[in-house]
């Protein structure tokens, strides 16, 4: 017993010299007159009281616990041990049996009501304790085997002779034999049985336990089952309203998300209106820009084998399939450079990837500042409906470009580069409402003038070859030499105008790409002007767009709290703003491995990471 019972505190006169003051251990003041001394400590009579009730301890017994003085009644109430038989507090000797405490006089045989003699064997039948005289005698025949079985240990199989026995799983056990079947740990508290064998809680869960699909911890007690998934009742929360599911209530399961049926229907309605608005707004163009040399962008949609331009898309009725696309890919644009005189106006289509498509199609070398990439085009049997002429009011044209290896001098006039691509009507009229259009990124390729042969197989490709470059002020600057656009090999470049024998066409299946050879007269090496491919998947790698890196905490979104994200983040691809190290830590994989997953799997991982 940690507390020490003390006799009545004795009055002690002050026998020390007057020069040495005696201080009260409770109030700290000088003791004068009669004082109490307890374990070499002195107290005023009025200061020596119970810590719990404040009663005077000078006239009665007390207990000391952790330096505090407590009266007998309060100590037993707060820290005392009760007898399992009489339910009174135990003072003095105590008997412990089967995890219970008794007064020595209260631990008696359940039959004869006599205390157990010292050293006598005690028989516990699962309910009462009996002495050796009152225990059932050993019977003959079948009864003898039953009695023998009750006294045999369920673990080692030996007879339980002297000492205590433990009854569990309808068997008697030696105290040291009741162990976990897997790890061998003694089970003196809780245990879980399986097929008549005892297991500790940890091993039982490891072998037979059910994990919660929400918190991934083992489930003990009540379990909520939804399909093949199991949850703690407190872990099964609706992702929309955050409320628990009551017993017997219907549940809508989608991936790892759980919905109330009403909440799921409301979310579907919101998503449908949001997607319809996004699809309809994605084909709207802004007014034309008056900036000279700005990159023009053309909207295309591929429907089967037919290519639709912006005019065809704009002519679609609002109730047709173009407005019912289920989250289409982002409409991408194929920019090219239009050289125009000062004062000319250029219109461009603006989409969701303006900045990204423009950065992708810029060259990675400074040597491309004044270069124009030209390409071979396979002639077709049709002529375009529109082409560019100086002073044209419409400003709409189709490119008619060719590379000539002859040495004809450059013309004194400079024709404007085309500003828009338009696809003429084809002979076959497909039904444009038969299925939703598929938006494609048009690839821009480097062109090589040195190779003039056409590959017959490459004519079947559907990738468009577009004129691109940087819109400088070459048409307006007087410092530019008239031969600045000529080739270094001596073959001057033909002016950008329609030549006799050239064909204009609206579809451009390209052959083998060519590049401009050799360094030019102005000292720029065109062979080093590596053009970034514009036909790559805009979300396939980190390199297609420079995403600003933010910490993971600033990108997390939740359903209950409206989080204000940074302004310049892509809300549909928040994971792209993570650093590679933090991306690995959050998703457990690299960005390349993440991109190879299916779309539903990526969305599922983003939901778990609160980035969706």
From Swiss-Prot:
Protein's name according to its UniProt entry: Actin-binding LIM protein 2
Keyword ATP-binding: no
Compositionally biased residues, Polar residues: 394-416
Source taxon at top rank: Eukaryota
Gene3D superfamilies with a match to the protein in the record: Cysteine Rich Protein, Villin headpiece domain
Region Disordered, residue ranges: 269-295, 341-433, 471-520
Binding-site list for Zn(2+) 3: 212, 215, 232, 235
Positions bound to Zn(2+) 2: 109, 112, 131, 134
Residues modified to Phosphoserine: 282, 294, 365, 368, 453, 477, 579
SUPFAM superfamilies the UniProt entry points to: Glucocorticoid receptor-like (DNA-binding domain) (SSF57716), VHP, Villin headpiece domain (SSF47050)
GO MF term list: actin filament binding; metal ion binding
GO CC terms, sorted: actin cytoskeleton; myofibril
Domain named HP: residues: 544-612
Compositionally biased region (Basic and acidic residues): 269-278
Intracellular or extracellular location(s): Cytoplasm
Species assigned in the record: Rattus norvegicus
Record GO biological process: cytoskeleton organization; lamellipodium assembly; positive regulation of transcription by RNA polymerase II; transcription by RNA polymerase II
Phosphothreonine: modified positions: 473
Record keywords: Cytoplasm, LIM domain, Metal-binding, Phosphoprotein, Repeat, Zinc
Binding site for Zn(2+) 4: 238, 241, 260, 263
